[in-house]
Amino acid sequence: VKTFFKVTLPMSLSGVANGLLLVFISCLDNFGTVAFLGIPARITVLSTDIYQAIISFSGNSFGEAAAESVSLGVIGVLAALLRWQVAKMFQTMQTDLEDMSPRFFLRRKKLLVESLMWLVIFIINFVPMLTLIVTAFMKGIGGGYGLDNMTLENFAFVFSNAKSFNAIKNSIFLGITTALICVVLGTIVAYLMVRRPSVLIRVVEGIISVPYSIPGIILGLALILTWARPLPIINRTIYATVFMLLVSYVVRFTSLQIRNSTTGVLQTDVSMEEAAEICGASGFKKWSSVIIPLIFPATISGMGLVFLNALTELTTSSLLWSAGSETLGVVIYNYTSAGYTTYACALSTVVCITILALVLLYRGVSAILRHKMGRNG
């Protein structure tokens, strides 16, 4: 116990503090859970209060929402700065070697502790998901769980309804397009940060990181106020189109790609690039034959993370969607708000199965790539 408090805890304090602040920032940004559970019970937080102020279209709704957004944004930025400062403060106490060996030996109590942990995980994770899936097959929520109350009509409706189908199409388009744009922008910034560090590139990286640090509801309001008017020269606006959502997703999730691409570039020995230059390879040849293959696992990991975040995004989309640009999160929320809970559960089940399949596919591809790289190495 003394070793834990004197050695282990101080050395892991950076990770613990980072985790706490990350959870705090995530809770500030959480809109979906609070909107589903809080709004019907008249429990409001800043994010849902901003949302309700905007959709009310009252005399000064945007002014009130902007004022609350500034308050929420300040809290989010301060939390992000504190997280960065904590990581910097305890950086010297970290070790380079990862040690996964156990610190405590529970002996006969091990089975009891593991059983309690699995019970908690089952209650807070698996039970809600099982309830969601079962409800997706029910004719009505009040009809019980008997076979006479089970049907596939909810799924038939989801796949035949124009709004549901359009939401699936829009979310897939936004997810793929956002991932492709972010991988290009994020990898370029990551490469410059590692290989060509400068004050300018640090400022650029900081600016790109801000939209991910602040709650998405603030970003949505900022984009509405910025893009609501027609663009100069072309006299066109992207407001109330799917491209407005694309802009918000790229702005919000590029930071995720930068982190993963930075890891890939850091793991690549600069001597490989120097060897390509000595052999007379052009910039394009160096990137296509050396850099991209070496950082590919990290960049593809970032792309997958960006795609999944874009596929399930609701916070920013709740403000920016319009007729024809609905996303999966928006349609599920609208179904629930309108009382069509079984339809919402059916569409949610489809989304969960899709995400599970994509995660398994990603892990399979990653395992194959690691095997090939290990064999070639």
What are these regions (language model features)?
Residues 73-81, 101-131, 202-208:
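N-terminal signal-anchor/first transmembrane alpha helix
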Residues 9, 68, 72-86, 162-195, ...:
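Transmembrane alpha-helix signature in integral membrane proteins
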Residues 2-6, 19, 62-105, 192-193, ...:
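C-terminal transmembrane helix and the adjacent membrane-cytosol boundary/short C-terminal tail
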Residues 34-42, 98-103, 138-152, 200, ...:
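Membrane-interfacial helix termini and adjacent extracytoplasmic/periplasmic loops
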Residues 2-29, 115-129, 210, 214, ...:
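Transmembrane alpha-helices
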Residues 119, 163-175, 213, 222-256, ...:
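Loop-to-helix entry region at the N-terminal start of transmembrane alpha-helices
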Residues 39-75, 106-110, 140-143, 150-163, ...:
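Interhelical loop and adjacent transmembrane-helix boundary motif
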